[in-house]
A protein has these predicted regions:
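Domain-level detector of nuclease and nuclease-like folds
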Residues: 69-253
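Cleavable N-terminal signal peptides
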Residues: 5-6, 16
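N-terminal module-boundary/linker segments of secreted carbohydrate-active enzymes
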Residues: 19-64
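Positively charged n-region of N-terminal signal peptides that target proteins for export
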Residues: 1-2
Length: 253
């Protein structure tokens, strides 16, 4: 069932998302360790049946940040009057099903280098998050190096046409399923498999009780993904039924 929601705030022109990204220099490789609360889940016990390519919606992420921006990635993504970011990469990870996946796999593959992390800051604004995604997820996949993993991510991001989500709102109202339909219209590869697109929401950070768009998951067959074969496959979890596209962008503190 299609659900209509109210868009209460004024829209920012789509041109604001088209500004050129200028990333600051990354001076040192981020040091990422496995959190104690996250166990190692070896590939042998958690085989990959589908890959999820996940993009986060910048306005919702930035609106949820509190206080001055300290993290370099947050400053790049959220610390400008009109950030050139809409949907940015969260990661590309393998899943066994909707509740299981491999993570923190042991690997001899080298991690991404400093220049490789720098290269991809305009699609994933945080070098630390890039390194985290490689160590937690990419190392469980078929890539021979962290650099190769991020090459695949960048190739897929460039291949996908990102619809202007702001245009989904009309006369102050929007249809939640329009996010899926907009991706299908922009990317014919999903025409026969809309279930390969999953919309994820988050509680509104403003206390309004609404739900905001958090992420869009695009799901693919595992076979050949490291070689640039991107074949849509149904996502292991259904989309959220309702969402609210927040049009405000966080201003510098």
């Amino acid at each position: 069932r299609l659900i209509l929601t109210t868009l209460a705030l004024s829209l920012i022109p789509a041109q604001a998302m088209a500004q050129q990204c200028v990333a600051a220099q990354v001076d040192a490789l981020p040091k990422i360790s496995r959190p104690a609360a996250e166990p190692v889940k070896p590939l042998a016990k958690h085989p990959i049946n589908v890959y999820s390519f996940v993009m986060s919606w910048t306005p919702s992420y930035c609106a949820g940040l509190k206080g001055p921006l300290k993290d370099p990635g947050d400053k790049l993504q959220c610390g400008q009057d009109k950030p050139p970011f809409g949907l940015v990469v969260h990661g590309l990870w393998g899943e066994t099903d909707g509740t299981n996946w491999p993570q923190w796999c042991a690997t001899k593959a080298p991690a991404p280098t400093l220049p490789q992390l720098q290269k991809h800051l305009c699609i994933m604004p945080s070098a630390a998050t890039q390194m985290h995604e490689w160590k937690k997820h990419g190392a469980c996949g078929p890539w021979t190096s962290g650099g190769a993993y991020w090459q695949s991510v960048a190739r897929l991001y460039a291949k996908l046409k990102k619809p202007d989500l702001y245009k989904l709102a009309k006369d102050g109202r929007m249809v939640s399923d329009a996010v899926v339909h907009a991706f299908v219209d922009a990317n014919p590869m999903f025409k026969d498999n809309e279930k390969a697109i999953q919309v994820q929401t988050m509680p509104a950070a403003d206390g309004s009780g609404k739900v905001w768009l958090k992420q869009v998951h695009l799901c693919f067959e595992p076979k050949g993904i490291e070689k640039g074969s991107f074949v849509p496959k149904a996502c292991p979890a259904p989309s959220s039924s309702e969402l609210f596209i927040i049009p405000t962008l966080r201003k510098p503190a």
